[in-house]
Amino acid sequence: MIEENKHFEKKMQEYDASQIQVLEGLEAVRMRPGMYIGSTAKEGLHHLVWEIVDNSIDEALAGFASHIKVFIEADNSITVVDDGRGIPVDIQAKTGRPAVETVFTVLHAGGKFGGGGYKVSGGLHGVGSSVVNALSTQLDVRVYKNGQIHYQEFKRGAVVADLEVIGTTDVTGTTVHFTPDPEIFTETTQFDYSVLAKRIQELAFLNRGLKISITDKRSGMEQEEHFLYEGGIGSYVEFLNDKKDVIFETPIYTDGELEGIAVEVAMQYTTSYQETVMSFANNIHTHEGGTHEQGFRAALTRVINDYAKKNKILKENEDNLTGEDVREGLTAVISVKHPNPQFEGQTKTKLGNSEVVKITNRLFSEAFQRFLLENPQVARKIVEKGILASKARIAAKRAREVTRKKSGLEISNLPGKLADCSSNDANQNELFIVEGDSAGGSAKSGRNREFQAILPIRGKILNVEKATMDKILANEEIRSLFTAMGTGFGADFDVSKARYQKLVIMTDADVDGAHIRTLLLTLIYRFMRPVLEAGYVYIAQPPIYGVKVGSEIKEYIQPGIDQEDQLKTALEKYSIGRSKPTVQRYKGLGEMDDHQLWETTMDPENRLMARVTVDDAAEADKVFDMLMGDRVEPRRDFIEENAVYSTLDI
């Protein structure tokens, strides 16, 4: 025991000040980049652009910039130009260096602190410019200010030379050019134009009257777009509803400021059954909602009920409409600008400032009440839509209760058609939704029974985009899926209760299979979106061809853009001597026996699966509505623009 204590004492003595590492300047950023930009993959790479653009947006919010330009240069570097006041170039008192140098070399240096520079700002609260500098092989900045052009260059965060004047000018603004460091971004340094363009368009919607341009100068990829929306978030709502039938033409728009907090709301009702509410705080998309959404939702419900009762559209003895009722078919965008936003939630995308509830509630209530009084015909349409939604909700509740009595939604009594797995480990378990009883039989026989469950579905499930809640709950196939997953439904939905963390859609490789897949994805997106956002949803990729020599299949060809090239290569490969390979075309899963289905599509060692993600919720919402909604013309236009007529199932 004494010897052990001596050993322990020796170990303790070895841990002294010499073992404490102090990272100077921006070394910490290069050592742990994920702490500052989230990741070093594609998302983190594009985050660099937003940090610089956010600084330019701050100038626009302060009223000093009207045009921002973003360039993807020919060498895949980025240039951001604005016509603001230009970053200060005079000496910063604390560092004794020019302010522009301090901004790019010192963490938490910028005009976002103390309230003296920017009243409202977005981004990472001042760390942005220096972080981008630290994670770039080269960064240079040009400041157009006081009639002079000031220039400074940096390499991997370090100053190359002092700030110098390189010319004269009669304009003001800042130009930042940087090249991401491949030592940091090992996965990719290639910028995705569509990712940048979508966010830039969103920023233009959120900042009324600000022009933002994006230009791609890369060889063979040249393109440019210019975004300017005088209607601001009102234009955003019109954009979101572009392919939908609206109840009234012009979106309701209101803006106001209280206690230094600015609130904007735009909203419009459509004939659909889905709600689309998007919220932002200081231009940051608050995916998880927050106090601004709380204030808006409460005001919307209260004002509509008050109007309905006062105008006797709802009788005094009738129940009030719920929030769910009044939001059916609603498209709304809420944007707040706060001098000191507090973000919470799992991904820090939930606004937490408690005072925002009452401010949003009050500002929106006053404007919405006024709108309803001034537009009685539109007001009646809004209330009547809520009443119809209420009736459907009550019918759905009755259907749910009847179903529960029959144990249809009780996990203790799983669907009879479900072939469950033996494991209780949700992290390992997989649920395959299989088209047809024939393929379902092969899948049940071929699966690994320990962790793979099979749920066969018959034919095409209900198109939930066109259905009311009571009809959805009355559909046996949909009920079976909810019950099997164990997540509950509607207000009771809880993704943490998912019995499987892989939900695999496995359909035939033909037009009908694609349609069933789309119907299932629509259901999941509309009513099980947390499962999608958690990354649990996959699409199986069964082979489309088998290359046979004699009776033996030598190679399977997976579906894809290059499937015909793959097939041609395989045929050449096995055309040796007298052997003549033949091609077996798999139109249906039922054409494969259980061993083949396991080997090609279900075996984790060999299979190919596509994970379904939602990178752009607004775009996803538009596409689902267009593909699965009532209007035929937008759907036909989309198919004509995007169809690839390489193979036809006739």
Curated annotation (Swiss-Prot):
It is an enzyme of class 5 (isomerase). The keyword Mitochondrion does not apply. One of its GO terms (cellular component) is chromosome. Its cofactor is Mg(2+); Mn(2+); Ca(2+). It catalyses: ATP-dependent breakage, passage and rejoining of double-stranded DNA. The keyword Transmembrane helix does not apply. Keywords: ATP-binding, Cytoplasm, DNA-binding, Isomerase, Magnesium, Metal-binding, Nucleotide-binding, Topoisomerase. Pfam families: DNA_gyraseB, DNA_gyraseB_C, HATPase_c, Toprim. InterPro entries: DNA_gyrase_B_C, GyrB, HATPase_C_sf, Ribosomal_Su5_D2-typ_SF, Ribsml_uS5_D2-typ_fold_subgr, Topo_IIA, Topo_IIA-like_dom_sf, Topo_IIA_B. The record marks 460, 463 as: Interaction with DNA. Binds two Mg(2+) per subunit. The magnesium ions form salt bridges with both the protein and the DNA. Can also accept other divalent metal cations, such as Mn(2+) or Ca(2+). HAMAP family: GyrB. Heterotetramer, composed of two GyrA and two GyrB chains. In the heterotetramer, GyrA contains the active site tyrosine that forms a transient covalent intermediate with DNA, while GyrB binds cofactors and catalyzes ATP hydrolysis. Belongs to the type II topoisomerase GyrB family. This is DNA gyrase subunit B. It comes from Streptococcus pyogenes serotype M1. The lineage of its organism: Bacteria, Bacillati, Bacillota, Bacilli, Lactobacillales.
